Amino acid sequence: MAAKMEITLSSNTEASSKQERHIIAKLEEKRGPPLQKNCPDPELCRQSFRRFCYQEVSGPQEALSQLRQLCRQWLQPELHTKEQILELLVMEQFLTILPPEIQARVRHRCPMSSKEIVTLVEDFHRASKKPKQWVAVCMQGQKVLLEKTGSQLGEQELPDFQPQTPRRDLRESSPAEPSQAGAYDRLSPHHWEKSPLLQEPTPKLAGTEAPRMRSDNKENPQQEGAKGAKPCAVSAGRSKGNGLQNPEPRGANMSEPRLSRRQVSSPNAQKPFAHYQRHCRVEYISSPLKSHPLRELKKSKGGKRSLSNRLQHLGHQPTRSAKKPYKCDDCGKSFTWNSELKRHKRVHTGERPYTCGECGNCFGRQSTLKLHQRIHTGEKPYQCGQCGKSFRQSSNLHQHHRLHHGD
């Protein structure tokens, strides 16, 4: 009996093992070819799946089986759940619909989830976003707010350009105020002798003649200013042979006595009074000052007027950078040039004298018309040196460069 029971048990175990092997074989047939131990890169599998061409295989059956195999290698259904596979498909489609510049940057970071992709795209938008600028424009009698962009550059008012006038000596510009011009007179000879500037031999004053020179300068400050504009600035040196023994040389002006501490410490101001050791040229004093217009100031009436007013009377107008004489009657804005005022008035009147011959659109400036005509001609003169992409405006090219540099 025991032997019979052992035989029946062994036969049952063999039958069950045969059934298990049969089931495993059927499952392997349904699953297809076994997976390789070393799984390839999912990104490479995705690219192979997307770039697969029908011409690479002999027929439709082989093409379909090849696509199935590439898709399984990419999605790996044996390792991933349905939700993970759906996430991969959504991520791929989301990357596909992104702009090319953003898509390239996101793929370079190799995100592992859709949340990472969204974070990268938001960071990119936050970095490239600028605060919008608005400008008020009068159109058909009504003020309208328009966003200021590169294409609307011609419609906006350019910032006022104020040229910097070069430094001129006192022969061309108006002299300093009386408070500044008299600073030199208020300093006594005792002060100049103790000044740290006078480390080298200084001009000697002849006894009681120095106070007389100071009194002469105070009595006639206009004469001092007029003669100070020319090379020999010491007016008392010519009155009856008094004053300094060695007058100033050519090229000196009245601004030199008012030396500040910065000028003392600079290398250019190491020897500020060395010119007293040289003599002026007599021929330079005798000929040019006779015909100089400042010499006629002594003969003019109204001696109480300031020297700047007399210069204006002689035709010396103030520089254009100091005034904006052209004023808009509508908004009160002032301009330096009349052409700027005319251009500004088009904002209020809505005048657009420049018309496009292709579509009939009108513009307020000729530069804006040229930018607009590039739309019709297809001209894109600004090209990126890294990727070769062309743009119509330089501002768009600058914004594109930020994508390469990651600004």
From Swiss-Prot:
GO biological process, one term: negative regulation of transcription by RNA polymerase II
UniProt xrefs under PROSITE patterns: SCAN_BOX, ZINC_FINGER_C2H2_1, ZINC_FINGER_C2H2_2
Tissue expression remark: Expressed in a variety of organs, but most strongly in adult testis and ovary followed by small intestine, colon, prostate, thymus, spleen, pancreas, skeletal muscle, heart, brain and kidney. Also expressed in umbilical vein endothelial cells, foreskin fibroblast and Hep-G2 cells.
Zinc fingers (C2H2-type) by residue: 326-348, 354-376, 382-405
UniProt cross-references to CDD domains, sorted A to Z: SCAN
Location in or out of the cell: Nucleus
Keywords linked to the UniProt accession: DNA-binding, Isopeptide bond, Metal-binding, Nucleus, Repeat, Repressor, Transcription, Transcription regulation, Ubl conjugation, Zinc, Zinc-finger
Compositional bias annotation for Basic and acidic residues: 211-221
Signal peptide: none
Pfam family, one: SCAN
InterPro entries: SCAN-C2H2_zinc_finger (IPR050916), SCAN_dom (IPR003309), SCAN_sf (IPR038269), Znf_C2H2_sf (IPR036236), Znf_C2H2_type (IPR013087)
GO annotation, cellular component aspect: chromatin; fibrillar center; nuclear body; nucleus
Position(s), cross-link Glycyl lysine isopeptide (Lys-Gly) (interchain with G-Cter in SUMO2): K26, K204, K230, K271
Biological role: Transcriptional repressor.
The protein's assembly and partners: Homodimer.
Protein name listed in UniProt: Zinc finger protein 174
Organism: Homo sapiens
High-level lineage: Eukaryota, Metazoa, Chordata, Craniata, Vertebrata
Gene designation per UniProt: ZNF174
